[in-house]
Amino acid sequence: LVIDATHPYAQVVTANIRKACEKFPHICLLRCLRKESEDEAKDSKGDKNGIIHVKNTAEAVRYLSEKEGNIFLTTGSKELVLWQGLPGHLERIFARVLPVEASVHICRELGYSGRHIIAMQGPFSAEMNYIQLKEFQCSYMVTKDGGDTGGFKEKMQAAKKAGATAVVIDRPKDKGMSLEQTKEAVKEWMKDVSE
């Protein structure tokens, strides 16, 4: 039995797990999906209540290329290179990344320095997100829906309090089951193997 409970945006890891399990037909693979956050509804323009939903990072870059104002980027360093197409990116972006040398190195290689690199380990409280939004005078917060364990709700609260627009990169579509369904499937699997 293999349970893939990786981060909802870890598509490469999930693909590798599936590929490895396909080599062994006797292995049962379960994909446990984190519950998505419930943010406020969107209107037909997709921008009600200061929340914009985009499909991916490239779409977020396109959207923000047409806007002015600083950007609090909470999506880490892995896709930071995609933001080089944003006009004024080195001045506008404040990137919060993991406090590890590899993440900081990526930021520096791309030209970011000083206060534009925020190396901290989350998840963060709504107050900490709010303080950072205000400190860097950000009009936008870019995030992914990491669910409750990823601090998504706190980010949305902070953006609303700060008057910043939240640009949410939606989760990739994936098939799987909830935590509760996964628990039940494991129980059934345990019954089957013990008989």
What annotation goes with each model-predicted range?
Residues 108-131, 135-136, 140-162, 171:
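A C-terminal functional module that forms or caps the active site or interfaces directly
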Residues 22-29, 91, 161-165:
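A short helix->loop->beta-strand "cap" motif at the edges of active sites that frequently abuts
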Residues 3, 30-31, 142-143, 166-170:
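Short hydrophobic alpha-helical runs that function as membrane-insertion/retention elements
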Residues 100-103, 166-177:
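Short, flexible loop segments at boundaries between secondary-structure elements
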Residues 69-70, 74-116:
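Anionic-ligand binding region
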Residues 1-60:
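Glycine/small-residue-rich loop that forms an oxyanion/phosphate-binding "nest" at active or ligand-binding sites
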Residues 49-57, 178-188:
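Short acidic-hydrophobic, aromatic-tinged amphipathic segments that line or gate anion-handling sites
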Residues 1, 70, 139-140:
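Structural motif
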